[in-house]
Structure formats: C-alpha cells, structure tokens
C-alpha cells in the first residue's frame, strides 16, 4: 500500500485509501509493459488482482488505478458476463473517478480534458489523443519524439531497432513503411519513437 500511495498525487491519497479499504483485492506494481498500463483479472480461486505499471507520472498512475478499480467493481456486482468496457464499466468508472475530478488533484488543462474524456470513456486513455498529449507533459523526460510530430517521409526507429518511414495519415492512424521489408503498418499518432541524430 505504501508504494502505491507514493505513486499517486498527494491530494488523492485519502480518497484512494478509502476506496481500497472497501475493496477485497490484491494490487501488484510491475515494471513498464509496452502494451498496457494496467489490468484486472479474477483468479481461479475467485480472488481479484490488479496489476499496474510503475511510472513517475502520478496522474497516469492514478487514472489507470481508477480504470482498473471500475473493472473490479463491475466484476463484484455483475455475476453474469458483460462487455469489458461496456455501459456497466463506463458507469462504474464515472462513479469512481468523480470525487477525483478537481484541480487539487488534476491540474488544468488535464482536469478539463479528463472530464471531457469521462463523458464516454474509452477502453484506454491512449485512444484519446488530447488527453494522451496532456498526460505526456508529466512523464519522465526522454529523447524520444511523438510520431505525429514527424514530417511525412521521415525515418524513425522503434525500441527493437526496426526502422520505418512515416507515410501518411489514415483516419486516426499513421501509415508507415518498414524499411527492411517494405511492408506497411499503422501506428498510433502519439507513439513514442526515436529519430537518427542530426548530422552537423
């Protein structure tokens, strides 16, 4: 519990302690995973587990925690099968996050963008471009750039060393061509990538 509370905004600690005291579940904090910020699952024995990525961004961590607590609440109150991010989850998420939606916990414009997001919350905050960019300001500083900031035709690299060229926008995604294979892939516009160092 102490580690978890150290990762959220100080103004949210009392609210979170109250929420967790009413919840019979285990919470595990793990190293960063590329595919998700957190997850909830029911174990075979019927107990519940939330796993959260450790992050230096207290606002991202808190949002993820509340997102997963909403899954827990739905699992506790609905014994029949419901959609993972259906209306039951959306309602539970709104109810849980409402006491946190103030500028003492989330500074503006983050608070306003989060309130807007909660009108119809997505399965992941990563699907909300404006919210993602606002949250990114509180991430640890990095030399990486956001893909949408690159010019069409510009070269970039993923963490695994694969090289791509940014091509064009397709609806909400960016089409990019892998240099080695020539295959086309769709990327999130806010994907963090590396670019070659500038030559003097």
Predicted region positions:
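Conserved short loop/helix modules at catalytic or binding sites
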Residues: 58-61
């Amino acid at each position: 519990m102490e580690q978890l509370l150290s990762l959220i905004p100080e103004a949210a600690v009392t609210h979170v302690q109250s929420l967790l005291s009413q919840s019979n579940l285990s919470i595990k904090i793990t190293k960063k995973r590329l595919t998700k910020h957190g997850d909830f699952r029911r174990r075979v024995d019927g107990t519940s587990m939330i796993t959260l990525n450790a992050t230096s961004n207290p606002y991202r961590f808190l949002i993820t925690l509340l997102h997963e607590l909403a899954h827990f609440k739905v699992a506790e109150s609905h014994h029949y099968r419901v959609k993972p991010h259906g209306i039951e989850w959306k309602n539970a998420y709104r109810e849980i996050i409402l006491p946190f939606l103030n500028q003492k916990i989330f500074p503006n414009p983050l608070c306003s963008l989060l309130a807007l997001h909660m009108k119809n919350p997505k399965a992941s905050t990563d699907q909300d471009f404006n919210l993602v960019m606002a949250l990114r300001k509180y991430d640890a500083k990095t030399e990486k750039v956001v893909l949408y900031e690159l010019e069409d035709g510009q070269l970039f690299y993923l963490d695994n060393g694969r090289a791509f060229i940014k091509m064009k926008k397709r609806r909400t995604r960016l089409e990019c061509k892998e240099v080695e294979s020539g295959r086309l892939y769709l990327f999130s516009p806010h994907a963090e990538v590396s670019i070659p160092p500038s030559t003097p």
